[in-house]
Structure formats: C-alpha cells, structure tokens
Regions:
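Short, structured surface patches at the beginning of a domain
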Residues: 1-168
Length: 168
C-alpha cells in the first residue's frame, strides 16, 4: 500500500509573506501623514513665511505680486482685497494681474481654483509672490496653512500678509 503524505499548513511551514523590515521602514518614512507630523505654532509658521519673504525680496527687490483672498459665497471681498493691495503698494511691489478671489469659504487650499491659478502663475514666473490680508485667506488650521506655504516656497515664491499669523 502506498504511503501518502499529508502536508499540514502551519506557521512553521508557511512561506514568508512579509516584506523585509527595511522595505516597510522605507515606505513608512515616505508616508508621514500630516496628522502625526508635529504641528507648528503660529510663531513658527510666521518665521517660515518671513524667511521666504526675505529670501525672495533679496533676489527681486521689486517683485511682481498676485493679490489673493478667500471669502464665503455671500461675502464682499473688497475690504480684504484693498488691504492686500495696500500692502503691495506700500512696499512698492508691482501688481501684475487681476486679484484672485475664491468664494469657497474655509475649504482646503488645494481645492481652490483661484489659488491654483496663482500657484500656476508662480510656476510660469509671471509673479514672484502672493499678497493677502491674513493667513485665514489660506487656512485657520496650522497644518493646511503650512502646506500652502510649502507649495508657495517650492515654486520659489513668497507670501506677504498684511497681518501676522498671531493676529488671527
């Protein structure tokens, strides 16, 4: 009578299905979500913004500016635009384009069409920076505001605000 062998599947006989730890560590290092990234304070965000502004002004003493504001659908943006425009005029900056106004309310900055157009203008070197009344034109959440600053700085642009981050 022939002998049949029954193979039993156990943890000891299973083929390893885990990637080695170095692969996991590599992937995790790339995927640091904002929720576990330490939040920067308003003062730290102000320092980041001002460093970018100083760097850009040293390269271009009379930069070309795009004016930006975000308001609720029923709000008039005139006051916010006037304050941002006044900031640009006081500093002798050039107003290169029509103001960009998003009537989206406090949505994530990456979803706003007029802000995207200004970022594209930075990419195409049509403007050197963005002027706004306050950081709340971008976000009142530090993580979203930091992301917006990073997007602007990655394009060698700057953000100039009429009020400081600690004034929100």
């Amino acid at each position: 009578m022939p002998v049949t062998t029954t193979y039993r599947y156990t943890a000891a006989t299973a083929t390893p299905t885990h990637p080695d730890p170095t692969q996991i560590e590599t992937v995790l290092a790339r995927l640091v979500p904002r929720c576990i990234r330490p939040q920067k304070s308003n003062a730290e965000l102000q320092a980041i913004r001002e460093a970018g502004l100083a760097s850009a002004i040293s390269r271009t003493p009379r930069p070309r500016i795009g004016i930006y504001t975000m308001v609720q659908a029923h709000q008039d943006p005139a006051v916010r635009l006037a304050v941002a425009r006044g900031l640009a005029v006081r500093n002798g900056w050039l107003l290169e384009r029509a103001p960009a106004v998003d009537f989206t309310g406090m949505t994530e900055p990456v979803t706003r069409p007029q802000l995207a157009r200004l970022l594209d203008a930075l990419d195409r070197d049509e403007v050197d920076g963005i002027a706004a009344m306050s950081r709340t034109d971008f976000s009142d959440r530090n993580g979203d505001y930091e992301d917006a600053l990073q997007r602007i700085h990655a394009r060698r642009g700057f953000l100039a605000l009429a009020t400081t981050e600690t004034d929100i």
